[in-house]
Amino acid sequence: MTVFKEILGNITDIENVESYQIENIHLTSDDVLKRVIIISSDQNVEYGIRLEEDKKLRDGDILYKDDYKLVVIRLELSDVLIITARTIGEMAQIAHNLGNRHMPAQFTETQMIVPYDYLVEQYLQDNKALYEREKIKLKEAFRHCSDAK
């Protein structure tokens, strides 16, 4: 079994990507937080992944590259709640409440994204918050604040 120990780049940086045979390794958002991963690709080849502790996999990361072939990480869609607050005060209130539940979160300029949880959805409904439930491809995995570096 081949064990990958480094990230060679990202497929978005490859100009002539159509000239390569691409073998995909599909991972969940939770998988990419593990230190050691053993998984089969979409071509039923078993691989190990063991990166340095400070390295995190992202969608499109290349683990193998030669003149003809790429082995690429593909993150699966994650079931999330995308919260758009009407005011900064409302966002602070929501973030405070979800923080008390130890919910991992990601932020954009205008939105808070959290993993789907029916109790969180009920809280948002009860408080008439603007939100949508969607399945999206996260750029990186959810982490708790203590895990963030």
From Swiss-Prot:
Keyword Chaperone attached: yes
Subcellular location: Cytoplasm
Pfam families found in the cross-reference section: UreE_C, UreE_N
Keywords, ordered alphabetically: Chaperone, Cytoplasm, Nickel, Nickel insertion
UniProt GO molecular function: nickel cation binding; unfolded protein binding
InterPro entries for this protein: UreE, UreE_C_dom, UreE_N, UreE_N_sf
UniProt-listed GO biological process terms: protein folding; protein-containing complex assembly; urea metabolic process
Main location: cytoplasm
CDD domains, per the entry: UreE
Signal sequence annotation: none
GO cellular component entries: cytoplasm
Domain of life: Bacteria
Known role: Involved in urease metallocenter assembly. Binds nickel. Probably functions as a nickel donor during metallocenter assembly.
Stated family: Belongs to the UreE family.
Protein name as it appears in the record: Urease accessory protein UreE
Top-level taxonomy: Bacteria, Bacillati, Mycoplasmatota, Mycoplasmoidales, Mycoplasmoidaceae
Gene name of the encoded protein: ureE
